[in-house]
Amino acid sequence: MGLFDRKEKYIRINPNRYVRNGVDHPVPEVPDDLFAKCPGCKQAIYQKDLGQAKICPNCSYTFRISAKERLDLTVDEGSFQELFTGIKTENPLNFPGYMEKLAATKEKTGLDEAVVTGVATIKGQKTALAIMDSNFIMASMGTVVGEKITKLFEYAILEKLPVVIFTASGGARMQEGIMSLMQMAKISAAVKCHSNAGLLYLTVLTDPTTGGVTASFAMQGDIILAEPQTLIGFAGRRVIENTVRETLPDDFQKAEFLQEHGFVDAIVKRTELADTIATLLSFHGGVQ
């Protein structure tokens, strides 16, 4: 050290090691997913305290969950049989990077597309079932999503089954352009055929349900349920405010606001959904 060099005023330590009783130890690693920040109360919540239903113990905020987690919560154990798994996503517009994004999302989520379709029983009531997963490109609706849901309604007509759909979506998939928008009319036509057959269609709106999904099959159910505080809408809040040049209510596009104005039949806690759906299916001549 030179004559005029300053001594450091701190001690250098290795953040990955610590010494106790003269023995060097590695610092235990804390798993990244040990805690979750609640968007409702802004508190750090121990993951185990959220429970299987993923509901904040402090403010009852309902976290988003995957399609698999939804299945585990809703259907009878071992009853789910997946349908229409072999449909491949194409890139009709040759949208740059689309196929790479799909491949990365498939690897991350373990899903082939943004919706899981099949048949299952809920508390003994048999139903055709679709669950959208916002982890897959925000459950945007492309041609495969449209095809799977359409086929589900066609299957339900043949088997004389009700249809239950858990919606969650950011809207039409922009990478597929007009092909994605066409799915709105395609699914709506299938819903109408199912209705003409005298069969029940029940939707459960989960956070978020927006865009083309809201403008089509999400709001066409004979019975429309929603989870608490679900974001439901077509255009974004700022787009609407800039268009109508008015300030919207704070709870605008929330499930509670829509129920108050007649667009949602009931808001049901996640832990009560399976029982509620089963009861509604039984009222409408459920199949066992």
UniProtKB/Swiss-Prot annotation:
Transit peptide among keywords: no
Record GO terms (molecular function): acetyl-CoA carboxylase activity; ATP binding; carboxyl- or carbamoyltransferase activity; zinc ion binding
Pathway(s) annotated for this protein in UniProt: Lipid metabolism; malonyl-CoA biosynthesis; malonyl-CoA from acetyl-CoA: step 1/1
EC code: 2.1.3.15
Chemical reaction(s) catalysed: N(6)-carboxybiotinyl-L-lysyl-[protein] + acetyl-CoA = N(6)-biotinyl-L-lysyl-[protein] + malonyl-CoA
InterPro entries: AcCoA_carboxyl_beta, Acetyl_CoA_COase_Trfase_b_su, ClpP/crotonase-like_dom_sf, COA_CT_N, Znf-ACC
Domain of life: Bacteria
Family as reported in the entry's similarity comment: Belongs to the AccD/PCCB family.
Function text: Component of the acetyl coenzyme A carboxylase (ACC) complex. Biotin carboxylase (BC) catalyzes the carboxylation of biotin on its carrier protein (BCCP) and then the CO(2) group is transferred by the transcarboxylase to acetyl-CoA to form malonyl-CoA.
Protein name: Acetyl-coenzyme A carboxylase carboxyl transferase subunit beta
